[in-house]
Design a protein with these regions (language model features):
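Conserved ABC ATPase "signature" region
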Residues: 52-53, 105-125, 234
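Conserved ABC transporter NBD signature motif
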Residues: 43-53
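A short, proline-enriched helix->beta-strand linker immediately N-terminal to the Walker B motif
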Residues: 149-153
Length: 335
């Protein structure tokens, strides 16, 4: 089974790359494989970090990168934090594992500073609490503190806000943005939540069935997207000022990676599908000659022609980009 195919990206310092898609699209397994966390994975290609290929590194060298230069935040902090050890001790252990010159006292002081940095109240006291004594939002903040303990150049955040309510989610995202501004950290944000993408991402990759469907900057993805899957994800979301009586879910289910359909993997669910989609797999290429906006779709890149196809197939045209932007800004919802 090929879980991910043809994935390529780069992340600059101080920028955030968002990777979005449904469950099983290959979002998480791609970064976990790059960091050597998927046993038995067969990988081709390169993953360059500071000029070195992470995919060919030995386990010892990779261990020196993980935590120190690349921090990771996982979806469930309760399962990521050891229940038998105090939160502060776990952060201190991370520091001392990678900084052999740090004493216990120095590591503890750094742990307290980190907890304060991510907004944990009374950090000098909470440093001695166990994970079960923290709320869900506080545990996630503690995971961010641990991931940022050594000021990594890159932070991989794998669904870090999924289990949090909207208020706590906003607080956690603000903590990450503040840390990014302070330290110039590059972030890879993996999520199925387009609201999170709208809040934090500079560039966005949309994945489906292990492949990239579309890649562009945030504004283009939200207002001038080209791929029907991206369009479907956005149309299935409720929005402020939306007067629709019903949401528009994407029909069907994602395919099994063991038995992918021929042609475009999205064609069984696509409202625009035509014969070529069923037999030929489109390459990821520029939309209308724009090399910063890539899409893997056989639809015309000209928006007017594409809307004509939409009207022919499903009876109404999609608003043009200027109209969509004006409507969003009138509702106060500019991404």
């Amino acid at each position: 089974m090929q879980a991910v195919r043809g994935l390529s990206f780069d992340v600059d310092a101080g920028k955030t790359l968002g990777i979005v898609g449904e469950s099983g699209s290959g979002k998480s397994v791609s970064t976990q494989t790059i960091m050597g966390l998927v046993r038995g994975a067969r990988v081709s290609g390169t993953a360059l970090f500071e000029g070195r290929d992470l995919l060919t590194m030995g386990s010892h060298d990779l261990q020196q990168v993980r935590g120190a230069k690349v921090g990771m935040i996982f979806q469930d902090p309760l399962s990521s934090l050891h229940p038998y050890y105090k939160v502060g001790w776990q952060i201190e252990e991370m520091i001392r594992q990678h900084d052999k010159s740090a004493s216990k006292a120095q590591a503890r002081h750094r742990a307290i500073d980190l907890l304060q940095l991510v907004g944990i109240p009374q950090p000098d006291r909470r440093v001695d609490d166990y994970p079960h004594q923290f709320s869900g939002g506080m545990r996630q903040r503690a995971m961010i503190a641990m991931a940022m303990a050594l000021n990594p150049q890159l932070l991989i955040a794998d669904e870090p806000t999924t289990a949090l309510d909207v208020t706590v989610q906003a607080q956690v995202l603000q903590v990450m943005k503040t840390l990014q501004e302070e330290f110039g950290t590059a972030i890879i944000m993996i999520t199925h939540d387009l609201g999170v993408i709208a809040d934090i991402a500079d560039e966005v990759i949309v994945m489906y069935a292990g492949a990239v469907m579309e890649r562009a900057d945030r504004r283009t993805i939200f207002y001038e997207n080209h791929h029907p899957y991206t369009e479907g994800l956005l149309e299935s979301l409720p929005a402020y000022g939306d007067d629709r009586e019903r949401l528009l879910p994407i029909a069907g289910q994602p395919p099994s990676l063991i038995n992918l359909p021929s042609g475009c993997p999205f064609h069984p669910r696509c409202p625009y599908v035509f014969d070529r989609c069923r037999t030929e797999t489109p390459d990821l290429g520029p939309v209308g000659g724009d090399v910063t906006h890539l899409s893997a779709c056989w639809l015309p890149h000209d928006m007017a022609a594409r809307n004509a196809r939409r009207k022919e197939v499903i009876g109404h045209a999609r608003p043009m980009p200027a109209e969509a932007m004006a409507a969003a800004e009138t509702a106060g919802g500019e991404a």
